[in-house]
Curated annotation (Swiss-Prot):
It comes from Oryctolagus cuniculus. Exhibits phosphohistidine phosphatase activity. May have a significant involvement in neuronal signaling. It is found in: Cytoplasm. The active site is at H53 (proton acceptor). The lineage of its organism: Eukaryota, Metazoa, Chordata, Craniata, Vertebrata. It catalyses: N(pros)-phospho-L-histidyl-[protein] + H2O = L-histidyl-[protein] + phosphate; N(tele)-phospho-L-histidyl-[protein] + H2O = L-histidyl-[protein] + phosphate. This is 14 kDa phosphohistidine phosphatase. One of its GO terms (molecular function) is protein histidine phosphatase activity. One of its GO terms (cellular component) is cytosol.
Amino acid sequence: MAAAGLAQIPDVDIDSDGVFKYVLIRVHAAPPSEAPGGESKDIVRGYKWAEYHADIYDKVSGELQKKGHDCECLGGGRISHQSQDRKIHVYGYSMGYGRAQHSVSTEKIRAKYPDYEVTWADDGY
């Protein structure tokens, strides 16, 4: 049941164009009381409306907690999404949460956008 709940959460939800902040979030399934927790998945969320990385984390974690999931922010960065050129570049870091593991974020983005050129770098802010 818990795994089914996690499966319904999209791995990636990012805006379609522009440069914006993103966070990598680990979502934990709400375990049954007699079973140990342990099932989790990492998700990528990035939006232009967010002034701070915490704005994204607070909104997403609040929505998921209402469904019984625990969340932790693994870090953040920026995404440059050029849909016309079919390119996404992941880079930078979050002042509050630190640098996300961009290689993990990039793999998840590649799975959602298989016909895009998806790259990452640790440099930049």
